[in-house]
Amino acid sequence: MDIPLCQSEHKPQLLLNDPAAIPLYHTAPERFAGALAPNAELCDAWSEELVPLPVGLALACPPEPDAEHCERPITMHYIEQCKEVFRPLLHDDAAFYYLHGAPTFPALRAAVLALGDLCGRTVIAELHVEDDEGHLPDGTDVRAAIGVLQRIGVTTVLISAHDPESLTQALEIAAPYARLSLGVCMHADWLSQTTLYNTEVIVPDITEAFVAALHGNQVSCKTLPRDHDDFICAPDGKHAHFIAPTIDISDEIECGPHLDEDLIEAEDDSGAFKLLLETEEDVVTLEESRYMISRPLCLCAESADLLEQGLRVVPGLALYDGTWEQEDAVISYFETKYGMIRL
């Protein structure tokens, strides 16, 4: 499936997710971008019945491990846990995978990395916003979440919410910064109360109602221009930061027992923190102190393996400024896999 997901002039389009809606697809195929099967059996059946519609599989993210009884780094353990859960569910005929139900944003990012380790299929991810200011339940800014996901292989983000106002606000906040396809999961009775900014895909609750609304031009859609292309989006994992390539970066900060204090001390002196990884224990310390990181983060390590471990546990996008120079092929891989930003 190409990016963006919707290639039709009939936008937004629907993801078929109900067997009862299959006759609607045959009647109005232009209204559908794809189909979302709940299991491999239906994925097989729909792949044959709905040709040429791409059919994907839904994958529920597992619960996060208990921090008190889990080996460190916890993120590494969770990535392996996701692989164990996802591996038997993967299917040759699935055109894409739809990740949903992640308990936190760092968990969703880890699930995306796990799926990327297992296969190279298109990934769609769901983000649930908790308020009308575009925050996820763990407080993550929706712009930060999208900024990370669009650089680690996710091609479409579907936003859900408790109410139409929160959904509208989240779309309006995210649309200027999104460089991937935006979609929504929504109820039909929200149609008159929701404005769909830059929305290409809808996962409906009642497919028939949405087909009728789209046919009758009863869906309020608006386009917002992309903004801030002159700046780099460098989320710390929770907050969105927009930086210039010439951002002031701190001196190297060791990930030792006083990392929290060192981060507080460096907070007013630079635009980004540069953390040095020298041992695997430093990676554990980095993970434990990530909630103290309120600036864009630059990682450096003499060992490419250590640098990769750091990239796996950091929920945001790490900067690379050339300290402890790595091979170009290695940095290119880190850019693709983890969204590392080469300055």
Question: Where in this protein do the model-derived segments appear?
Answer:
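Domain-level signal for soluble alpha/beta catalytic cores
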Residues: 1-343
